Amino acid sequence: MKNKRSQNSPYVTPNNPYTTLEKALGYSFKDKRLLEQALTHKSCKLALNNERLEFLGDAVLGLVIGELLYHKFYQYDEGKLSKLRAAIVSAHGFTKLAKAIALQDYLRVSSSEEISKGREKPSILSSAFEALMAGVYLEAGLAKVRKIIQNLLNRAYKRLDLEHLFMDYKTALQELTQAQFCVIPTYQLLQEKGPDHHKEFEMALYIQDKMYATAKGKSKKEAEQQCAYYALQKLKEAK
């Protein structure tokens, strides 16, 4: 199953449809099949998809980003470092890094996901980013992943510190809705699936009994934060 968007891109070459992606990433895959697997969502119903690579990438990125923050923010205690890491090691954080290399343009998704703009969904895009980094790790090792992540953090964030990077979207939204509607948001679990070691939660956010957002995450807290982020954006656009 070929990616039509990639095929029609003016940057694609016949022998390597991922030339521009690899250039943006700063790494050229030796095994293009590994790259294709990292970009293939399970909705394609192919023999190989990116779920196993996503599992590995989650662990690799947690280590790499934790190490980078440990060395960069020597003045932060464990609590602050954990908050900072939580802002990056999340669907929202990885989506931001993925979009820095236009990863969404290269994903292989089913026609139904294409119609529903699946390639833009944080749950799909962030998972593909984790899988991509796992592929780099398998071929080139931890040092190469570390270099790529450092470059992407510099490109994706104007400032990398606790004040500007980590924002408690739930608190920010609650303050806004109390001021604007005299109510606080409520959250409802829509779906919980997957094995214990790889859970996925889908939450919905309501304001005055109206659904404002839904989001998925690896924990209820992450999904709620993502919902709050979407709701904040929607309320800002409505002003």
UniProtKB/Swiss-Prot annotation:
Cofactor(s) in the UniProt record: Mg(2+)
Annotated residues for binding of Mg(2+): E54, S127, E130
Matching PROSITE patterns: DS_RBD, RNASE_3_1, RNASE_3_2
Stretches assigned to the RNase III domain: 18-141
Reactions performed catalytically: Endonucleolytic cleavage to 5'-phosphomonoester
Compartments, as annotated in UniProt: Cytoplasm
Pfam family, one: dsrm
GO molecular function, one term: ribonuclease III activity
Biological process annotations from GO: mRNA processing; regulation of gene expression; rRNA processing; tRNA processing
Record keywords: Cytoplasm, Endonuclease, Hydrolase, Magnesium, Metal-binding, mRNA processing, Nuclease, RNA-binding, rRNA processing, rRNA-binding, tRNA processing
Protein family per UniProt: Belongs to the ribonuclease III family.
Name of the protein in question: Ribonuclease 3
Protein source organism: Helicobacter pylori (strain G27)
